[in-house]
Amino acid sequence: MKPLLAKDLAAFMQRFNNFKDGEFRSLEVISPTIMKIILAGQDETRAFDWISLELEFNGVSDARLLDSAKLHLVNMSEGINLIYDRNFAFAVGEYNNLSNIKDSACYIVCRDLKYKESRF
């Protein structure tokens, strides 16, 4: 897994078009402070081919999670958002700050973020 740094977030999200119209494939709670999700989306650097992307959240301090059986029902038309404001924050939907992210149906706030690309 590669670390995702705060300075690289904007380019990372642009590369995958915020996972708009992508797929929320899985969510796994490894421990109370470590969580993983798998998303599928189109990669701008690969001529918009579909890939899977695993995100690992370490040092989780707050979260609202969905039941894994309901992930296929998540509306991904707005994609996801990743921001950094002293901590990383992930949310399904268009949110631009930490307080708004907590309005999302699914969000995770953590200290460190890593990712791994794989085949669709």
Task: Describe these PLM feature segments.
Residues 1-120:
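Surface-exposed, interaction-prone regions used to assemble/regulate multi-protein complexes
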